[in-house]
Amino acid sequence: MKKMLIQGGNLLSGEVTIGGAKNSTVAIIPAAILAESKVVLDSVPHIKDVNSLLSILEDMSVTSTFTGDTVEIDPTNIVSTPLPSGKIQSLRASYYFMGALLGRFGKAIVGLPGGDDIGPRPIDQHIKGFEALGAVVTNNHGAIEINAPEGLHGAKIYLDMASVGATINLLLAAVRAEGQTVIENAAREPEIVDIATFLNNMGAKVRGAGTDIIRIEGVAHLYGHNTHTIIPDRIEAGTYLSMAAAIGDGVNVKNIISEHMDAYLAKLEEMGVKMDVKEDSIFVYPSPDLKMVQVKTMPYPGFATDLQQPLTPLLLKAQGEGLVVDTLYPKRTRHVPELIRMGADISIENDVILLHHADKLQGAEVSADEIRGGACLMIAGLMANGVTTITNASNILRGYDRVIDKLTGLGAVVKMVEE
């Protein structure tokens, strides 16, 4: 495990380029095994989760190379291997191998997923959908076994909640199933559109991605053709926008699709953050006078749950009393006691985060227990007086592309060392 050392108080300036979307990439890499030829991905983020997924592919005799920002995956000689534990349990996105293996082989054995501890994230909607497609699902000592001995068939599936993970997993399973599948109350995130585009470019027939009804006409084969460029990471972008507003002296955040961030940008504007929003970049001006706001996370196109923690340090700079309510993951609050160690006036009451203006944070030793909480502490450390040490900082590397290089490029004094 690594720790991050931050010398706080240095104003950031310059420009930073956002990488490809983590939440697209970690689904598209498992989806690549649905193809019967080589797949090429561009704008792939340099994050730990990508390396973990490529390692899992290697266990299935799928070869890959990662050069620059390009990943080539060749599933030609894939072997249907059980993935019961070990690597598979280190990241939540590993559960996309359920849908991908089921779609490719009609069977899968995958360990229950790990990832960030941000509260309960059950996979019952995934299982319900697999069963509707004709699969039998059992839990065997912590591994999910899925079998469709008579093959998968199209079905009408209504999701009880608009789950991103379930929508993607069912999309992967249904894309080579016989007949038409309709997913109702589907999640609408931009990453789902990206994944559907990737599949369609290989010959899939997916319509309606980005709406709450997705229709999939099953096809027999998929083949990699053109290079697929992954969309920019709206969560990474939001993190750097918050950072730029909190401790920036003029920062240009490049490679952004601002339409993917409407709810977040509206909240920044409500706070009084001064921005120049262009087609593919956002310039953030110094914004000394900020107004406190209330934040409520919602499924897309609402305010993203992954951005409530990166926004929190900026909220602490604002005048007044604010609150954060995470309707998706109410227990996503482990960053709060760490911020208190740094002198923040912040508390939790009935899963609601209450905030007041903090004149100045102080450097401290804090723990990054998950990706976005780590990003929150990273921004707080940049704002604080003195040195902040973030333990368990490997979690930050799971979700943020070349974060040390990007921070130092903006003028931050920061380094990553082994614990």
Curated annotation (Swiss-Prot):
What pathway does the UniProt record associate with this protein? Cell wall biogenesis; peptidoglycan biosynthesis
Q: Which positions does UniProt annotate for UDP-N-acetyl-alpha-D-glucosamine binding?
A: R92, R121, P122, I123, D124, Q125, D306, L328
* Binding-site list for phosphoenolpyruvate: K22, N23
Report the InterPro entries cross-referenced here: Enolpyruvate_Tfrase_dom, Enolpyruvate_Tfrase_sf, MurA_subfamily, RNA3'P_cycl/enolpyr_Trfase_a/b, UDP_GlcNAc_COvinyl_MurA
What GO terms are given for molecular function?
UDP-N-acetylglucosamine 1-carboxyvinyltransferase activity
Enzyme class of the recorded protein, top EC level: transferase
Q: Which GO terms describe its biological process?
A: cell division; cell wall organization; peptidoglycan biosynthetic process; regulation of cell shape; UDP-N-acetylgalactosamine biosynthetic process
- Locate the active site: D116 (proton donor)
EC number(s) from the headed UniProt entry: 2.5.1.7
Q: Does the record carry Transmembrane helix as a key word?
A: no
Which superkingdom? Bacteria
Kindly list the cysteine pairs connected by disulfide bridges.
none
Q: Which reaction does it catalyse?
A: phosphoenolpyruvate + UDP-N-acetyl-alpha-D-glucosamine = UDP-N-acetyl-3-O-(1-carboxyvinyl)-alpha-D-glucosamine + phosphate
Which cellular compartments is it found in? Cytoplasm
Methyltransferase among the record's keywords? no
Q: What is its main location?
A: cytoplasm
* Annotated GO CC locations: cytoplasm
Q: Which UniProt keywords apply?
A: Cell cycle, Cell division, Cell shape, Cell wall biogenesis/degradation, Cytoplasm, Peptidoglycan synthesis, Transferase
- Protein family (similarity comment): Belongs to the EPSP synthase family. MurA subfamily.
What biological function has been recorded for the protein in this entry?
Cell wall formation. Adds enolpyruvyl to UDP-N-acetylglucosamine.
According to UniProt, the name of this protein is: UDP-N-acetylglucosamine 1-carboxyvinyltransferase 2
Q: What is the organism field in this record? A: Latilactobacillus sakei subsp. sakei (strain 23K) (Lactobacillus sakei subsp. sakei)
> What's the source species' lineage?
Bacteria, Bacillati, Bacillota, Bacilli, Lactobacillales
